[in-house]
Curated annotation (Swiss-Prot):
Cellular component terms (Gene Ontology): cytoplasm
Organism of derivation: Escherichia fergusonii (strain ATCC 35469 / DSM 13698 / CCUG 18766 / IAM 14443 / JCM 21226 / LMG 7866 / NBRC 102419 / NCTC 12128 / CDC 0568-73)
Principal location listed in the UniProt entry: cytoplasm
Name under which the protein is recorded: Regulatory protein RecX
Pfam family, one: RecX_HTH1
Organism taxonomic ancestry: Bacteria, Pseudomonadati, Pseudomonadota, Gammaproteobacteria, Enterobacterales
Family (UniProt): Belongs to the RecX family.
Gene name as annotated: recX
């Protein structure tokens, strides 16, 4: 940390840090609070910012006011991103919970997203096990276990074979 930055008020340093963090990607409010509270890595090792709780609250409020921090936008983008990577609704809900997003906000966003989880589960299964999907019980169990690990619901997994039989 240079001498000029160490003279800046803690609020200004926190605000600068928050904007830099949020410029990279969206974060939940809890993630941003955790990152702001972490020590800054300087040339001489970790350096603490002598900021008060009020400074942190002002920075968070400023980020909300100016549109840098929006949990609903974060949730929508997170769901879209993780579903594109092949994860199911149960896994996405768990990850959002770990990121400090309320259950209500998560459920609202999951209802609003337009994702066909059954089709996504089928795509993941065919990507991993090939087309056509096996009909032997032991192979079905492997696919089921894989999809459950990826976060798909049992009803979506069972629909794969129901739709396959049609």
């Amino acid at each position: 940390m240079t001498e000029s930055t160490s003279r800046r008020p803690a609020y200004a340093r926190l605000l600068d840090r928050a904007v830099r963090i949020l410029a990279v990607r969206d974060h939940s409010e809890q993630e941003l609070r955790r990152k702001l509270a972490a020590p800054i890595m300087g040339k001489n090792g970790p350096e603490e910012i002598d900021a008060t709780v009020e400074d942190y609250e002002r920075v968070i409020a400023w980020c909300h006011e100016h549109g840098y921090l929006d949990d609903s936008r974060f949730v929508a983008r997170f769901i879209a991103s993780r579903s594109r990577k092949g994860y199911g609704p149960a896994r996405i809900r768990q990850e959002l919970n770990q990121k400090g997003i309320s259950r209500e906000a998560t459920e609202k966003a999951m209802r609003e997203c337009d994702i066909d989880w059954c089709a996504l589960a089928r795509d993941q299964a065919t990507r991993k096990y090939g087309e056509p999907l096996p009909t032997v019980f032991s192979e079905k169990v492997k696919i089921q276990r894989f999809l459950l690990y990826r976060g798909y619901l049992m009803e979506d997994i069972q629909d794969i074979w129901r739709n396959f039989a049609d």
